[in-house]
């Protein structure tokens, strides 16, 4: 009887220990899976955010470059320099338009309005740069400077503000 009591007492003690052991193993497996999911989601978010910020940096740089090239066209004195500047502006505009198109995939619903504003500001800037180059080519430097320091400068500044606004949400 004493032997049977010892066995049943051992069993009574071991059953909760085994149950706790099984629960801890299951709990650890679930915790590891949850950590992997969180890590995967965080990596995806971080990668998207970093790529988004990189694209925005390229857009910002191209915008500033185009604005500077517009002013360079005004101060150019010979035809070859003007033609070279126009080619550079067209190249930069093409790259910027590609960057804007590539950036669309990162635009969230909350950023859509700001992105649309950015594109509209670029379109205004692009149109007025054409006017700057026309005035400059005709020798109307004052009108060209007025546009460069007015509408084009304002559009460029608005684009920079749009980019800052989008970066804040990332």
Task: Give the positions of each predicted feature.
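Extracytoplasmic/periplasmic/luminal assembly and interaction segments
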Residues: 77-90, 96
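Polar/charged, Q/E/K-enriched amphipathic alpha-helical segments with strong coiled-coil propensity
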Residues: 74-83, 104-164
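Charged catalytic carboxylate motif
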Residues: 34, 58, 95, 158
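Hydrophobic membrane-targeting segments
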Residues: 1-54, 61-81, 133, 167-170
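Alpha-helical structural motif
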Residues: 31-34, 38, 92, 121, ...
